[in-house]
Amino acid sequence: MALALRRLDARPDCRVTAVSRLYRTPPWGKTDQADFYNSCALVETTLSAKALLAVCLDIERDMKRERIERWGPRTIDIDILTYDDERHGEEALKVPHPRMTERAFVLMPLADIAADLPVDGRPVSDWLGDSDAGGIVVANENRAWWRG
């Protein structure tokens, strides 16, 4: 995950401006696997949402991401949760992310960097208050964990 953030930040058309704490999360969906690590980042970019998605997918491929099993183990998973006030409903790009408000493992790190961000008419902090964060723990408090 740190490598993916550094790769984004190294691009001339992207700048990582904030990164959440790193969280360890029990597996979700398919539970017979190791814990996941989750974080969120705020990225300023001159790329369109679709172009940013293409960059993220390239980073995933370079990091040997294989899409074998839904909710299964993976080396990296980069999602675009929001993109300004834009809405996208294509199969490959759904923004805002359609399930982000149901997932504490998304909302906790997102609240670290954008607690007041409105998503579907409510701030992230409100969505987080309604979610089940059981088992999610901070793995690294240092917000510079990704810098290596």
Predicted regions and their residues:
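A broad, low-specificity signal for short, low-complexity segments enriched in glycine/proline
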Residues: 1-6, 40-44, 67-71
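Short, charge-patterned binding micro-sites
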Residues: 18-44
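N-terminal beta1-alpha1 ligand-phosphate binding loop
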Residues: 1-14, 20-24
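Flexible, gly/pro- and Lys/Arg-enriched active-site loops
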Residues: 13, 28-35, 50-53, 57-148
